[in-house]
Curated annotation (Swiss-Prot):
Keywords: Biotin biosynthesis, Methyltransferase, S-adenosyl-L-methionine, Transferase. Pathway: Cofactor biosynthesis; biotin biosynthesis. This is Malonyl-[acyl-carrier protein] O-methyltransferase. GO terms for biological process: biotin biosynthetic process; methylation. The lineage of its organism: Bacteria, Pseudomonadati, Pseudomonadota, Gammaproteobacteria, Oceanospirillales. The gene is bioC. Converts the free carboxyl group of a malonyl-thioester to its methyl ester by transfer of a methyl group from S-adenosyl-L-methionine (SAM). It allows to synthesize pimeloyl-ACP via the fatty acid synthetic pathway.
């Protein structure tokens, strides 16, 4: 019987690189997702849909040692365990609040639940058959550190299956803010080509597949509330400081309404699904 334990935090405090995207403050990422732990599963429909596709892709093999990196609430960790009941499964997340939630709701699913930085995992070299990660990589400044870490812990022939957000994500929201102020209100994301180049540079072989997911909402304000409810609002250092005034917010909503379709106000997610093997 698996026994889930909490071990000490393994969060890197090393300087972050920039990649001209606006540096990500990891402490704010952890804080944001900790605050969203209780509401995440109710609101993260797109993230769950992408995660289910990753679980389906993972079933092509028979891994014995698996890590779920950026495990969040543990919902997908549970899905992985259902797919591979005999596997040794460990789960890590940057957010203490998410790990606490996962322990409370999915205690015996993983052998280890731990707070850890995906760029510096407490995992032995060449020890894993499958590295799994859903919607976590986009919170890094430079994906090369993550791909290098995944390559380090994978056995030869082991697989990395992960997802990230790409350049066109939430372009409707960014356009709605354009002209209201000079700040950036949506995180900057990499292209599929940049992601693939980073993976190959770290000794991985495979591809980054692109897809568009469009979710419809009653209003632009509902889009923003959902993003906050899953902890995914803009946390890069170049974000505008201070409160968003009611007058500016009304202008954003008016701009966003120009995108309205029959189903409602769209929010587009440009998703990259990475399927790689260690050479």
């Amino acid at each position: 019987m698996n026994h889930a334990v909490t071990i000490k935090s393994f969060v890197s405090t090393s300087p972050l690189s920039d990649l001209e995207r606006g540096a990500v403050d990891k402490s704010k990422v952890a804080e944001s997702f900790s605050a969203a732990a209780a509401t995440y599963d109710l609101l993260a429909g797109m993230q769950k849909e992408v995660g289910e596709s990753l679980v389906s892709l993972s079933r092509e093999g028979c891994p014995q040692d698996i890590i779920d990196v950026g495990c969040g609430t543990g919902w997908l960790t549970h899905r992985l365990k259902n797919s591979f009941p005999e596997a040794r499964l460990c789960a890590y997340d940057l957010s203490p609040g998410m790990i606490e939630y996962a322990l409370a709701h999915h205690d015996n699913v993983a052998e280890i639940w731990a707070v850890a930085d995906m760029e510096s995992l407490p995992v032995a070299n060449a020890s894993q058959d499958l590295v799994f990660s859903n919607m976590a990589m986009q919170w890094l400044d430079d994906p090369r550190a993550w791909f290098a870490e995944a390559s380090r812990v994978l056995r030869p022939g082991g697989r990395l299956i992960c997802s990230t957000l790409l350049t066109q994500t939430l372009f409707e929201l960014e356009q709605a803010w354009h002209g209201v102020d000079g700040g950036r209100h949506v995180n900057r994301f990499l292209s599929a080509e940049q992601v693939a180049e980073a993976a190959v540079s770290c000794g991985l072989r495979g591809e980054c597949r692109e897809s568009l997911y469009v979710r419809f909402h009653d209003s632009a304000l509902d889009v923003m509330k959902e993003l906050k409810g899953i902890g995914a609002h803009n946390i890069q250092s170049e974000r505008p400081q201070g409160l968003t005034g009611k007058r500016r917010l009304r202008r954003v909503i008016e701009n966003y309404e120009k995108c309205r379709q029959e189903q409602g106000v769209p929010a587009t997610y440009h998703v990259g699904v990475c399927v790689y093997s260690r050479i």
